[in-house]
């Protein structure tokens, strides 16, 4: 994806450099950075998909959107990062005409799907927190799956436009021939498409996210007590007291405060994802806009590398954010690793009675770090008899 070349040399792909002018130092730095970032990102995003699909309590609408985002990021890392490595090694396009079409298509599909996935979970968070009654029938897992299918279907059809713009460009020099995946039309034809992408998949999602997270912050941080009558604390206390007067009466305030803290934490985590998306995509998007108005586009190799690294970081960093800011994701990642390490060991049979006290809030459909409080008495006894379990054996 580059708008940084002139009509006489129309390269495509994620900001591929002018290979005939790169130095050995540039090649080494490119290969090492791309391998490191893309490798970690691929592993991290695969883990996100696995923990959500294999852990029952992680299958929430918000996590459904995060799986969509992880798949899109995987597509970007594989379709954009790996071709950059081969071009740095061979200084030429090695995947042929079909590879040129398919790889470029997958790059744009991943980028556009990730942008819409972020927009989808932003809207879902807004409804869940600012309109908790509506969230009970709008923020459901089945509806989230339908929205994701629509997002990917729309992005798939939209990105087919690139099939009609791409071709292999061959440059013949005295001692070598360089093949590149580029455009078969002049820059005046494909620049408007870049500008349309800029508006639909960057400006619009970021403006919408800014407005919605502002409204969320006003409700969640300035007035944390939910306005939904079903969540009235006094009613909740009375109902819980009738069910378990001895244990639950001591946990009412703590559990309710824990729910509020959980809602804040998940909102902070998703807001960080959006902010990083905005800042890490800004160098590339800015370059595209600026080059659209320059007669001789700016294409300094080191700056192009910087733009690429920012894009790869955006696709690779989300699993790190989940691990740092979500206790449930952190525990699920740990269980996934332990499950593979202990796969050959047969777990001991056990039978332990646990008393669960679930806090039901109107946005429980969408909170991936929603707390399930276990009484201290049973928890202490459970710790002595329950070992590590794999993700598929969640209570």
Swiss-Prot record:
Sites carrying sugar chains: 3, 10
Disulfide bonds: 100-181
GO annotation terms (biological process): phospholipase C-activating G protein-coupled receptor signaling pathway
Keyword hit for Cell membrane: yes
Transmembrane annotation, as ranges: 31-53, 64-85, 102-123, 147-170, 196-217, 269-290, 299-321
Cellular localization per UniProt: Cell membrane
UniProt keyword annotations, A-Z: Cell membrane, Disulfide bond, G-protein coupled receptor, Glycoprotein, Membrane, Receptor, Transducer, Transmembrane, Transmembrane helix
Mode of membrane association: Multi-pass membrane protein
Protein name (Swiss-Prot/TrEMBL): Thyrotropin-releasing hormone receptor
Organism field: Gallus gallus (Chicken)
Gene giving rise to this polypeptide: TRHR
């Amino acid at each position: 994806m580059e708008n940084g070349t002139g009509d006489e040399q129309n390269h495509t792909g994620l900001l591929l450099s002018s290979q005939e002018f790169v130095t050995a130092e540039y090649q080494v730095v490119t290969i090492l950075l791309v391998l490191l970032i893309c490798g970690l990102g691929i592993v991290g995003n695969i883990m996100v998909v696995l923990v959500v699909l294999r852990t029952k309590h992680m299958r929430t609408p918000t996590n459904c959107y995060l799986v969509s985002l992880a798949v899109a990021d995987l597509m970007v890392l594989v379709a954009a990062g790996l071709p950059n490595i081969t071009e740095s090694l061979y200084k030429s396009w090695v995947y042929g005409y079909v590879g040129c079409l398919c790889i470029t298509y997958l790059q744009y599909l991943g980028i556009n799907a990730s942008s819409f996935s972020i927009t989808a979970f932003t809207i879902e968070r807004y409804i869940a927190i600012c309109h908790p009654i509506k969230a009970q029938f709008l923020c459901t897992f089945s509806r989230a799956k339908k929205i994701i299918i629509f997002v990917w279907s729309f992005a798939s059809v939209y990105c087919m436009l690139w099939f009609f713009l791409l071709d292999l460009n061959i440059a013949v020099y005295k001692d070598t021939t360089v093949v590149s995946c580029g455009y078969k039309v002049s820059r005046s034809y494909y620049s408007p498409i870049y500008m349309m992408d800029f508006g639909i998949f960057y400006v619009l999602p970021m403006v919408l996210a800014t407005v919605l997270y502002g409204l969320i912050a006003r409700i969640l941080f300035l007035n944390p007590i939910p306005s939904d009558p079903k969540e009235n604390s006094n009613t909740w206390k009375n109902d819980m007291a009738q069910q378990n007067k001895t244990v639950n009466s001591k946990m009412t305030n703590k559990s309710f405060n824990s729910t509020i803290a959980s809602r804040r934490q998940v909102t902070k985590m998703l807001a960080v994802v959006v902010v990083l998306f905005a800042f890490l995509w800004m160098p590339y998007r800015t370059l595209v806009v600026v080059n659209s108005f320059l007669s001789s586009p700016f294409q300094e190799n080191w700056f192009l590398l910087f733009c690429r690294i920012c894009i790869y970081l955006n696709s690779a960093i989300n699993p790190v954010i989940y691990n740092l800011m979500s206790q449930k994701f952190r525990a699920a990642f740990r269980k996934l690793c332990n499950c593979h390490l202990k796969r050959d060991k047969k777990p001991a049979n056990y039978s332990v009675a646990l008393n669960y006290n679930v806090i039901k809030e109107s946005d429980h459909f969408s909170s991936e770090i929603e707390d399930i409080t276990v009484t201290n008495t049973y928890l202490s006894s459970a710790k002595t008899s329950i070992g590590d379990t794999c993700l598929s054996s969640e209570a």
